[in-house]
């Protein structure tokens, strides 16, 4: 974040500065806090399914993390295009983006080489774009509440059937007891996905390793980009 501010002070183009300070830097701050909350609410040592509200907190922060991860790359692209007065040359606002050919052909060699690597290409296409697009436009990212063995699944179904049989009978204490037992069954799920119908495009990913890896990627790219963004091709 501080590096974005420092680099913005070296230029006098207000629109470019805004994308660094109020765009990328602000997003990085949100990502840092979201990452912290994910690990606070859902420690790796968790051995019981999370309560529903806690799981929602984790999902909210996962959503914030992923949408801003995508946005950081967009903000860097805008800062670069505006700094070098390339908006018309790239074809207008819809062609601004670190992963869009019209913008990439003007990037410094070091930045382009990094983005064009096999690792980054796969990361962007199979993960970042897929999961961000689903989150923004289709199905939000989801952490299943628990994993059940066959026996646990059968017990859960028995309890659920009894709950339905009590509907309208005002037996609230029994309903609460059934719900409490259901919540205690199973083990936590440490994966996330979006759609259940999109196959490989929504393959389950390990939550904690993924957000750590993403954080490393955006920090690494940020240092590389800010070291070279005064150059253009």
Where are these regions (language model features)?
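Active-site gating/metal-coordination segments in enzymes
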Residues: 43
């Amino acid at each position: 974040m501080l590096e974005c501010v420092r680099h913005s002070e070296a230029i006098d183009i207000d629109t470019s500065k805004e994308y660094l300070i109020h765009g990328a830097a602000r997003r990085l701050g949100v990502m840092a806090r979201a990452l912290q909350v994910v690990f606070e609410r859902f420690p790796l040592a968790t051995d019981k399914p999370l309560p529903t509200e806690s799981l929602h907190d984790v999902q909210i922060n996962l959503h914030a993390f992923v949408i801003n991860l995508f946005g950081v790359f967009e903000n860097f692209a805008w800062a670069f295009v505006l700094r070098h007065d390339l908006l018309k040359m790239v074809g207008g606002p819809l062609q601004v983006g670190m992963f869009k050919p019209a913008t990439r052909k003007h990037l410094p060699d070091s930045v382009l080489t990094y983005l064009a690597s096999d690792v980054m290409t796969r990361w962007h296409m199979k993960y970042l774009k897929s999961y961000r697009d689903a989150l923004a436009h289709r199905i939000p990212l989801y952490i299943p509440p628990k994993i059940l063995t066959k026996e646990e699944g059968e017990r859960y179904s028995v309890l659920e059937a009894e709950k339905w049989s009590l509907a309208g009978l005002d037996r609230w204490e029994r309903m609460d007891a059934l719900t409490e037992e259901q919540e205690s069954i199973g083990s936590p799920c440490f994966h996330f996905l979006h759609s259940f119908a999109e196959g490989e495009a929504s393959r389950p990913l390990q939550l904690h390793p993924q957000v750590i890896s993403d954080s490393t990627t955006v920090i690494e790219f940020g240092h590389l980009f800010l070291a070279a963004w005064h150059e253009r091709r």
